[in-house]
Regions:
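SAM-dependent transferase fold signal centered on methyltransferase-like domains
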Residues: 2-176
Length: 176
């Protein structure tokens, strides 16, 4: 038996209703969750992200996630990692860090850090250029185009862009 749900579904609530004997398949295309499927099975979570000819797969059980050790970083290392949307939707917040030996930046964000570059990481990776900007108006290159990510920060990407007069684009990434 297979049941198809909207990508907006609360998977934890659905599993409470359906029971634990369902495999959950979260399918994303280019980091956007498109399908949430439940198939009769053994309770395995399948987080899949399709990017062109490549497919990232991350499988786990809810018990794996519960038992995974969470390490919080004392500071930001050379690389920042963001798991793909399927992994986030599946709820593998601790396990992705444990499997790839990453430290989480904060308990309330899904960004991780490491001094090692992991080419096979299922998500986005950024190399850190600066970890702290004390005077953004002076230090940010207003001629460059920025893609801005705001996680657990009081300003939205649009507010940051307006405040510092930054152009939208993919020349550089600014993480707030």
């Amino acid at each position: 038996i297979m049941i198809k749900f909207s990508p907006m579904l609360d998977i934890t609530a659905a599993l409470r209703v359906l029971g634990r004997d369902w495999d959950t398949h979260i399918v994303a295309v280019n980091n956007e969750v498109k399908e949430v499927l439940f198939l009769t099975g053994t309770g395995v979570m399948h987080a899949v992200n399709i990017r062109g000819m490549q497919t990232d797969r991350f499988f786990f059980s809810p018990e794996n996630e519960q038992q995974a050790q969470l390490t919080i970083a004392a500071d930001i290392h050379q690389y920042i990692y963001e798991p793909n949307a399927a992994i986030i939707k599946a709820g593998a917040y601790r396990l992705v860090g444990e499997r790839y030996e990453l430290q989480k930046l904060d308990t309330n964000t899904h960004l991780y850090t490491s001094d090692s570059f992991i080419s096979c990481f299922p998500g986005r990776v950024w190399e850190v250029i600066k970890t702290e900007i004390k005077e953004p108006k002076k230090q940010l290159d207003t001629k460059a185009k920025y893609s801005i990510l705001s996680r657990n920060y009081p300003l939205s990407p649009d507010d940051i862009r307006k405040k510092y007069k930054l152009k939208d684009g993919d020349d550089r990434y600014l993480l707030a």
